[in-house]
Amino acid sequence: MNPTSFIYDKPPPPPIINKPFEQTNSSASLTQKNSSSETENVGRHGKRRMDQDLSFKPTKRGSGRGRGRSFRGGSHAGNTRGACAVDGIEYLKRRNISINTPEEIEAWIQERKKNWPTESNIRSKQEKEKVMENLGAADTSQSIDAQPTPSQHPLAHHEPHEKRGPPKKKSLYTKLLNTQLEQENIFFLQFMKLYLKKMGMVVKPVS
């Protein structure tokens, strides 16, 4: 018998084929692992609400809805021209103004021209103001000149009131000094009375 020859006692094993039930088992094991990790996280960081969606992701700051009125501008922060156009359309809708035909557009322009600062409008406004001044009407405008400045306001330079606290306690030195001064004053008054009596001067009590 040739030693190099090899005799197979058993047939070779069949090739491994991934069956569908094995794939489902692997996916189920992955979901079980994820759920177990989530329950561990919930146990560490406190209870999670039952009605909260696990796939919920918080929105970024400043990405709120609205026409550029969020914290950082929103989605329409740079598009101010379109926002102004939309605001103008909404204004017209609220005022029930329709400018669909050329006649309506022309009428709307003529109506707006009445308030334009032309020379005739300025002249008529000045005449109305003069008439109101002659009638003695008070000026209720909110201009800068009509309002007093902080330096002209009467309470601008008013000193704040000092808070009343408990009386200060006198030290022993001040008490002794006060008693000594009182005694010296009494002695001086007695000396002046005796001196005036000796000189023949009458001392009348002050009424």
From Swiss-Prot:
Which keywords does this Swiss-Prot/TrEMBL entry list? Nucleus
InterPro entries hit by this protein:
NUFIP1_cons_dom
Where do Basic residues bias regions lie? 58-70
One Gene Ontology term of the biological-process aspect is: box C/D snoRNP assembly
What's a Pfam family in this record? NUFIP1
Compositional bias ranges of the Polar residues kind: 21-40, 140-152
Entry superkingdom? Eukaryota
Looking at the UniProt record for this protein, which Gene Ontology cellular component terms does it annotate, in alphabetical order?
nucleolus; nucleus
Q: Which ranges does the record mark as transmembrane?
A: none
Disordered: annotated segments: 1-81, 140-169
Where are stretches of biased composition, namely Basic and acidic residues?
Answer: 156-165
The places in or outside the cell where this protein is found are: Nucleus, Nucleolus
> What protein name is recorded for this chain?
Uncharacterized protein C16C6.03c
What species is given as this protein's source? Schizosaccharomyces pombe (strain 972 / ATCC 24843) (Fission yeast)
The organism's lineage is: Eukaryota, Fungi, Dikarya, Ascomycota, Taphrinomycotina
